[in-house]
């Protein structure tokens, strides 16, 4: 699955100002969703949706937990894959190798590096019987006014021309004293014709 927002076929965005129960502004949240058409064969369409979600509390507030939902309840759709965003304490190893040959001489080299995540815990709610996936992000040390950007994605198959995806962001903002305010939700269903 592509995990970069480049060369996309379609995109959409939504955002909202977040208010407390007295109507005072306490931050913003929003996203841009990118669609990539992967394969069209007969009535089947395979596409990726990558969402760049931003949770931005104002100074005096912080994010203690954020979630991003991607999927659809429409018939004729199936989630094939979902991004595995690593969690606190988990590590990812990246490798690269190069080789070359010219006139019987061969050379090359390789390297690898490991990165261990220590900024947040990520819980994945991936029920394989449904066509939705939810990532829940809990910052290890949520700072006052710190914004968080998360980039989950899914690969879906649709057996129709109109390909649907719902994007939902949820986040209760928290005061610096640890008092959790309203659960704030931003949700919209989108489609592309493919």
Regions found by a protein language model. Give the residues of each.
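Surface-exposed charge patches in extracellular/virion surface proteins
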Residues: 2, 25, 40, 74, ...
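Membrane-insertion modules used to breach or fuse lipid bilayers
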Residues: 83-131, 163, 167-193
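Amphipathic, membrane-active segments
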Residues: 124-168
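Deployable pore-forming modules of oligomeric membrane-permeabilizing proteins
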Residues: 1-95, 124
């Amino acid at each position: 699955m592509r995990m970069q927002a480049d060369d996309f076929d379609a995109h959409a965005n939504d955002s909202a100002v977040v208010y407390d129960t007295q109507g005072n502004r306490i931050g913003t949240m929003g996203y841009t969703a990118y669609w990539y058409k992967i394969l069209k064969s007969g009535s089947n369409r395979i596409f990726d949706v990558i969402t760049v979600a931003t949770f931005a509390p104002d100074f005096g507030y912080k994010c203690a937990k954020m979630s991003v939902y991607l999927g659809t309840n429409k018939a004729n759709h199936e989630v094939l894959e979902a991004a595995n965003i690593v969690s606190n304490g988990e590590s990812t190893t990246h490798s690269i190798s190069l080789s070359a040959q010219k006139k019987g001489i061969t050379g090359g080299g390789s390297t690898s590096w490991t990165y261990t995540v220590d900024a947040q815990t990520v819980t994945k709610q991936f029920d394989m019987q449904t066509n939705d996936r939810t990532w829940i992000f809990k910052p290890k040390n949520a700072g006052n006014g710190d914004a968080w950007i998360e980039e989950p994605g899914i690969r879906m198959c649709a057996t129709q021309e109109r390909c649907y995806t719902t994007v939902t962001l949820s986040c209760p903002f928290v005061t610096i004293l640890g008092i959790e305010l309203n659960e704030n939700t931003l949700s919209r269903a989108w489609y592309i014709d493919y």
